């Protein structure tokens, strides 16, 4: 994914302004306390990958990123990022080549994050809040990182900055899966004064997207499980899957306040098949969040985030009660989360945040508290030069 400081800001260019190389590093260390596994770890009752998820409790590396951007000259550049979450192995989050034939156009090919807007794209990692928003988790299995080609257009018209993006993707990650011929994405955004508005659409047509049976477990993965002929501990979906989203952000130039909101709609239509039967499935999952931040003083901020996720699911055919039991769909209850955050920013690139919250899904509720240390260095070489000149 287009990560590190630049990508998590959602809009900044990760390539150096002039020909040369930039190396950056960013990370978040977290200690989270909760009396039991958080409901969002598995999101029971929602159709997802069906894995055991990542246990957020205890002390762990929430996210670490080492990235490098290389601008060959005005038109060509390359970017790569290596990331790590918790005990998961390190993985390539981004590896792409970019061509900019002019000031307005850019063509990016390789592994990257499809454009979803200034609110949705960066939400969830190196964020102000510790946990990935429920709506983003349910729609994309946390983050959408994919291999493909994306064409972008940027232009200032009057007092507004316009953005358009279109992408073609391999589509093997959730909500795509095996057999996806090609996934499509479209994004449009406008920034005018204090406000930014974004909308996006994504379309997948998997022929073998798997979901592990509720009792099968399995390690955490961003990819959709691959179906096989045996269908052992697996339920397979074949059909159309779409995600639509819209978001808004307000960054006041006059007040120490900011606010944002996002809504995502994930729609599935197609057959579900397992050893126990075949059913026609229709699922509509709608979720979103609102967030507000008050900069109490230059080094202190107070924030709150409210979230809700709900789903309407229809399953018809022979043996559908057994399929629903395999998937744990009978455990469905609307999910919600509320969190309050106090942040201390002692210097640029360093933040300490205390967060308390509560969340519910699948019929149970859990409180949690987290202490996080987040750091980010855009340009390691420049930081070292600055440190050497300091008295």
Language-model-detected regions and their locations in the chain:
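Short glycine/proline- and charge-enriched loop/turn segments
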Residues: 42-50, 126-134, 319-324
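N-terminal cationic amphipathic segment used for targeting or macromolecule association
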Residues: 3-10, 128, 246, 293
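Outer-membrane beta-barrel pore domains
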Residues: 53, 95-100, 198-205, 212-391
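Short, well-ordered turn and helix-capping elements at secondary-structure junctions
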Residues: 11, 84, 170-172, 215, ...
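Hydrophobic alpha-helical segments
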Residues: 42, 76, 88, 107, ...
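Short, solvent-exposed loop/turn segments at secondary-structure boundaries
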Residues: 175-179, 363-365
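Outer-membrane beta-barrel biogenesis signature
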Residues: 1-56, 207-210, 300, 346, ...
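Outer membrane beta-barrel
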Residues: 18-38, 53-171, 178-184, 189-197, ...
